[in-house]
Amino acid sequence: MNIVKIKDLSLFYGKTHALKNINMNIEKNKVTALIGPSGCGKSTFLRSINRMNDFIENVNIDGEVIFHGKDIYKEFDEIDLRKRVGMVFQKANPFPMSIYDNVAYGPRIHGIKNKNELDIIVEKSLKKAALWDEIKDRLNKNAQGLSGGQQQRLCIARTLAVEPELILMDEPTSALDPISTSKIEELMHTLKKDYPVIIVTHNMQQAGRISDDTAFFLSGEVIEFGKTSNIFYNPQDKRTEDYISGRFG
């Protein structure tokens, strides 16, 4: 079942044509990887799905991004959209407050004030992010004292606390060590049971390990999109084959 349908999506930074007629369906219960060389448009595309590009001047968008049957650029309030479409960034960005308050931040903004209810949300979110057992005895400690990998999982917990329906990840492990990377990759396999995940990654091995579907971007276009096994082992376009095999990138 499709949760997002992208139809003829183009994006311009001023006169620069950054995304060119993108068509793609994102399915439930899957991890979709976006791969391609630097500057190919994959992060711009990711930010188009929750309207993060709205913060950039001189951006113009054509086409449609359909989420639950509605065009996000015409029929959605952007605040509500970003609650329903969570985002995890390349660099962990915990707020300068306690671990507890980091996770409770979103629910509080959306009107939840009851302490018992917040306690339940915080514990549930940290457990889903595979972090609870490591920090349950220091919830009132400053979140910025956590390790890099723990901080990134905290950011995932913070995203989960507002009950999103889709999770976007922009190179979430690029600054992490192999052990922390492995934990987050395992977490993605668990999360996809409840949340579709779209991840930008420069790591071909990672894309192969974690994703069900893969889209290869080049110069603002989707060159090829399909099952990850097909993209990696039976690409239909020579450019895809060249990129996967390391001939450029």
Curated annotation (Swiss-Prot):
Its EC top class is translocase
Q: What is this protein called?
A: Phosphate import ATP-binding protein PstB
The record gives the membrane topology as:
Peripheral membrane protein
Q: Which domain of life is it from?
A: Bacteria
Gene Ontology BP, a term: phosphate ion transmembrane transport
Q: Which CDD domains match?
A: ABC_PstB_phosphate_transporter
Where in this chain does the record put each ABC transporter domain?
Answer: 4-244
Its subcellular locations are: Cell membrane
Q: What does this protein do?
A: Part of the ABC transporter complex PstSACB involved in phosphate import. Responsible for energy coupling to the transport system.
Entry EC no(s): 7.3.2.1
**Catalytic activity reported:** phosphate(out) + ATP + H2O = ADP + 2 phosphate(in) + H(+)
Q: What quaternary structure, including any partners, is listed in this protein's UniProt entry?
A: The complex is composed of two ATP-binding proteins (PstB), two transmembrane proteins (PstC and PstA) and a solute-binding protein (PstS).
**Positions annotated to bind ATP:** 36-43
Q: Which Pfam families match?
A: ABC_tran
GO cellular component annotations, sorted alphabetically? plasma membrane
Q: Name one GO molecular function term.
A: ATP hydrolysis activity
- What family does this chain come from, according to its entry? Belongs to the ABC transporter superfamily. Phosphate importer (TC 3.A.1.7) family.
Annotated keywords: ATP-binding, Cell membrane, Membrane, Nucleotide-binding, Phosphate transport, Translocase, Transport
